[in-house]
């Protein structure tokens, strides 16, 4: 039986890194899917824009029913290795295999809507079996608030290290392996020139798969490290576990107001994040015509997410929880406005502007969307105080639903907007209308959603003092 002292365990650096490897793995696997699958589907796999959008939408609708079942199933069961940890291995291996299949150049299925749909659906269902237990594991490591803040900083540093591999190096590696239209190009890495090919041509299919397969091997190793170096301490009692029901989801939604508010913030944050990520490749390829810069610009943009999370706990103390989010959401908006300046005629070749705009934008984005995960354990504790049940997996399933709704909106609607604006999947050049559509989805819609997010987080009710009071009351109840 776990002691109260064990529940307030001060996490070591090794434990924080071990858990953070789970974020590293999932960003490597699913971040690449979110950032580049649409581009691959449309240009290399030659699936139409509208069809790809409907694939993303339909799979997310299924998630609405699937995720609560996963949350309930996980919360009702435990094993010798723990309640949540085993799923990192049980579902982790199928996750990386299915992910690789989405980019696999299999003869006879190129352009097959049925194949793309089935594999993407299976991948998304399996992803829930990894992501929901992983999110629940976060709240079971410790109840110490200081350790939770430090854990959030560490895991986001590792998550953004994976983003460096995804958004910075992945497109460059694929272009290095792409066979068509190869030429020596300035990468923007301080004069570094590389022989790069056209990665949006169907002939680049083996290049995509080869690079992604290597990423999946790294992701599988990272999931194993996460499993090996984590320990569950804050766990539900046997009575709480036995009493878990699927209807607990509706109870949490009705009575856990902080959960609903945080969920809405998650939904909006992931919506504007994936609006931007979905069309990032299109923006670089067709608006500013500098896809060869994606590696260099992405490298500069990755610095805030890797180097600065260590300062998050201190900044939260200075500005407060809500002030922290307001500061970095405002910074994101400023970066987006500078991105719009970069998109204007005559500014496309301004590499310095690309660096500054993306650096500021990503600093705001990674901080606001990274630190929000630190609020999930306190929402779980609040729910336990109100209901008497520690429904960690169910609450993480609810959070997963919110962020997947955002992921869906941010992944599907941009593609439909591009179709409305006249995007040509096979065209090397795009019309002025299509360019306007890319800018709308990459800049203006994310700005509007970020502004709404600032309003949502303002009404979030749990302060740091409330967290201390909640933990004290839970201690008294358990004693």
What are these regions (language model features)?
Residues 2-479:
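Membrane-embedded alpha-helical bundles of multi-pass transporters/translocases
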